[in-house]
Amino acid sequence: MANKAVNDFILAMNYDKKKLLTHQGESIENRFIKEGNQLPDEFVVIERKKRSLSTNTSDISVTATNDSRLYPGALLVVDETLLENNPTLLAVDRAPMTYSIDLPGLASSDSFLQVEDPSNSSVRGAVNDLLAKWHQDYGQVNNVPARMQYEKITAHSMEQLKVKFGSDFEKTGNSLDIDFNSVHSGEKQIQIVNFKQIYYTVSVDAVKNPGDVFQDTVTVEDLKQRGISAERPLVYISSVAYGRQVYLKLETTSKSDEVEAAFEALIKGVKVAPQTEWKQILDNTEVKAVILGGDPSSGARVVTGKVDMVEDLIQEGSRFTADHPGLPISYTTSFLRDNVVATFQNSTDYVETKVTAYRNGDLLLDHSGAYVAQYYITWDELSYDHQGKEVLTPKAWDRNGQDLTAHFTTSIPLKGNVRNLSVKIRECTGLAWEWWRTVYEKTDLPLVRKRTISIWGTTLYPQVEDKVEND
């Protein structure tokens, strides 16, 4: 066995993997109230609630700022820096490691390689040599489509996004310029989507004994001097996925509850019919993207535009070619002591802002009947007190109970906060035993953009129509 002393030192470590790999983000109290704002064309209700998000993942994203330390076989220290995806690399003399790559067509003898002293440069050089051989000998007959993965979330806070996409997402988030103030005020809805297009994965053979990864020159004292202990054990990067990833910000000022469904249709490439609510939402959506990998440049690329560029962005990196070599986009780690895959557990509280808009409407009355008519129209107007509780204020039309003759027409504007709308219309029959006859009576009418109630006919045969236009 290579380096028995170091092997025994690592095997003797006793630690709680879950505790080491758990990160708790923000903790907040649920002290939020509803509020309502009457705008010129609509009544907007803003409701904020405490939400919690937890994730368990072994797949860690790679960013442009940390990829030089993240190569297959790298030894990383399990501490706060690893939880923040800004890991500490253990640089010591290393024993050879065997690597494999999952590109199609490779003969068994060509699908793996050995690196004598694994480091970022030596591993990258060996992988690049193998890729060059694949392109030359196999690439012409093996067309490799990217393996597509995506995940999405409606944005409410940076802590929430860091739990969802990785603890170092803030770097990418800053490039996306996420306007959380507008989200919290209810002015915008924002969704973040992460597309991963994986071209190939490089893996290392599982470590049989912890000491096998070190040269004999490495001592237990060397590890202790670098802070390695049961409180700060080691993991090794067991695989790295190479390809391209795109972070999309979809931002709209629409207050519709169909925004998430419209964005889902966009992401999945569903054809959206014209003159639909989804089309209106997407036409009112701005897109910003941060693109990592997929071209020879190692830098991140930021582009902005409308939703019609989303499909092009995805298709742009859909296949692995020599012109689209890919970069490290994610990695997994295993504990050096026992090869158990390291699973990171992150959680946070955040404030979810839900905005509901109620459009103003009009109630049109049209009376052309050969009789005297009376209207009784009442409603409540909704508001919220300082504790966020609903307050309903009774209102009534100022011409209720008046005798009105044909031809009478009027429009009653109703604000978006109208609730419990009731309309009663009666006509004078002239009959002693039924002087007033009810022509129309409905309660709790929904507020619509335009409702026209028309009455006509004679005293004994009154007619009525209730026409709703809600485009």
Swiss-Prot record:
Gene3D superfamilies: 3.30.1040.20, Perfringolysin (3.40.30.40), Perfringolysin, domain 4 (2.60.40.1430), Thiol-activated cytolysin superfamily/Thiol-activated cytolysin, alpha-beta domain (3.90.840.10). Keywords: Cytolysis, Hemolysis, Host cell membrane, Host membrane, Lipid-binding, Membrane, Secreted, Toxin, Transmembrane, Transmembrane beta strand, Virulence. A motif (Cholesterol binding) lies at residues 459-460. It is a multi-pass membrane protein. Elongated monomers align along their lengths, indicating intersubunit contacts and suggesting the prepore structure. Modeling based on cryo-EM shows a homooligomeric pore complex containing 38-44 subunits; when inserted in the host membrane. The size of isolated pores is detergent-dependent; in amphipol A8-35 homogenous rings form with 42 subunits. A cholesterol-dependent toxin that causes cytolysis by forming pores in cholesterol-containing host membranes. After binding to target membranes, the protein undergoes a major conformation change, leading to its insertion in the host membrane and formation of an oligomeric pore complex. Cholesterol is required for binding to host membranes, membrane insertion and pore formation; cholesterol binding is mediated by a Thr-Leu pair in the C-terminus. Can be reversibly inactivated by oxidation. This is Pneumolysin. It comes from Streptococcus pneumoniae serotype 2 (strain D39 / NCTC 7466).
